[in-house]
Amino acid sequence: MIQKLSNLLVTALAVATGVVGHGHINDIVINGVWYQAYDPTTFPYESNPPIVVGWTAADLDNGFVSPDAYQNPDIICHKNATNAKGHASVKAGDTILFQWVPVPWPHPGPIVDYLANCNGDCETVDKTTLEFFKIDGVGLLSGGDPGTWASDVLISNNNTWVVKIPDNLAPGNYVLRHEIIALHSAGQANGAQNYPQCFNIAVSGSGSLQPSGVLGTDLYHATDPGVLINIYTSPLNYIIPGPTVVSGLPTSVAQGSSAATATASATVPGGGSGPTSRTTTTARTTQASSRPSSTPPATTSAPAGGPTQTLYGQCGGSGYSGPTRCAPPATCSTLNPYYAQCLN
C-alpha cells in the first residue's frame, strides 16, 4: 500500500510540475516509399519549409494534448493544427508505417488510428467538420502494473507502427489520424497525454465502405475509463477510449519495421510529384528516421562514461535497459518505479 501511495504521489508531482514525454512522427512509408511528415521542432524556424503530407502543429516541445482540451479543436490533429498542403496517394488495402521520434518512446499506453472523409480536398477542409471512424486500436496486451502495451510493440519495432487502409474503403480524400495515448500519469485527473498526428491521403480503389464517424471533439471525455486510470495495478482491465473499431476490420495488423526504397514528395492539388528511385537504402536504426540514405548518419560526441539519453527521454525504470545517464544539462529524475526521465 505504501508503495502504491508513493506511486500516486510522484505521478501527481509529475503532472503538477508539467513533466511531459515528447514525440512526433518524422516520416511515413507507403509500400516502400518514404514521405516527410511535419517536424514541429524545425519547420517553424525555416523560412520556406517543405510541403509535406503531415498537418502542421504548434507542439514546439513535442508535447501533448491533455484531457481538459478534449472538447477543444486541439485534440483533432494536435495544438493549433492546420491542414497539410499536400497528400500521399494510397490504394485501399495498402499499409502505412509511421516513424516516431525521438526513440525510444517512453510511455505506456494504447495506439489508435482513425480516418475521416474530407468530401473534397483535405488541404482545405475545416477540421472541426471531420467525422472520424476508428480503423484499429490496440491497448493492454497482457499483465498489468503496468503490463505490456501497444506502445511496447511500437518500441520493439524501433518506434514504428503499421496501419492498414481497409481493403473495401470507398475511394476519396481522407485525413488519417494516428494517436498514442500515454498513461503513465493517468491515475490523476488530467494526467493522460494524447499525441494525435494527422496526414492527408488520397485513397483509390473500388470499395464501398463509408462508415459513419464522430467529430474529433467528441472522441473522448476526461472521465472515460480508458483515460482516467491508474495503470500501476494488477490485475488491470483496460478499455480503449473512443468509438469502437469499424465492424469487420481487424483491431491491428502485423507490426514490423522495414527500410524504404524510394522517396516521394507530397502531391499538391492540381499538381503532382512521384517517387525518386534510390540505389542505396539503409535499414532503420535506433536514432535515425526511415528515410533512404546513401551517406552515413551524422554522429555527435557524448560525455565520457557511456551512452546518454536525450532531454525528455527515458533514463530508468523497471525493465528499462537503455542509457541511464542524461546529456547535459539534463539529469535523470525518477518519477515512479517504472519510469525515470531526463529533465532540466
From Swiss-Prot:
Disulfide bonds join 77-198, 118-122. Keywords: Carbohydrate metabolism, Cellulose degradation, Copper, Disulfide bond, Glycoprotein, Metal-binding, Monooxygenase, Oxidoreductase, Polysaccharide degradation, Secreted, Signal. The keyword Disulfide bond applies. This is AA9 family lytic polysaccharide monooxygenase cel61A. It is found in: Secreted. Changing residue 45 to A/F/W: Leads to lower C4 oxidation and higher C1-oxidation. The gene is LPMO9A. Its cofactor is Cu(2+). Binds 1 copper ion per subunit. One of its GO terms (molecular function) is cellulose binding. The keyword Secreted applies. Belongs to the polysaccharide monooxygenase AA9 family. It holds the Pfam family CBM_1. GO terms for cellular component: extracellular region. SUPFAM superfamilies: Cellulose-binding domain. Residues 275-310 have a biased composition (Low complexity). Residues 307-343 form the CBM1 domain. Lignocellulose is the most abundant polymeric composite on Earth and is a recalcitrant but promising renewable substrate for industrial biotechnology applications. Together with cellobiose dehydrogenases (CDHs) an enzymatic system capable of oxidative cellulose cleavage is formed, which increases the efficiency of cellulases and put LPMOs at focus of biofuel research. Changing residue 232 to A/F/W: Leads to lower C4 oxidation and higher C1-oxidation. Changing residue 105 to A/F/W: Leads to lower C4 oxidation and higher C1-oxidation. Residues 262-310 are annotated as: Disordered. Lytic polysaccharide monooxygenase (LPMO) that depolymerizes crystalline and amorphous polysaccharides via the oxidation of scissile alpha- or beta-(1-4)-glycosidic bonds, yielding C1 and C4 oxidation products. Catalysis by LPMOs requires the reduction of the active-site copper from Cu(II) to Cu(I) by a reducing agent and H(2)O(2) or O(2) as a cosubstrate. Produces both neutral and oxidized cello-oligosaccharides from cellulose. Also acts on soluble cello-oligosaccharides as short as a tetramer.
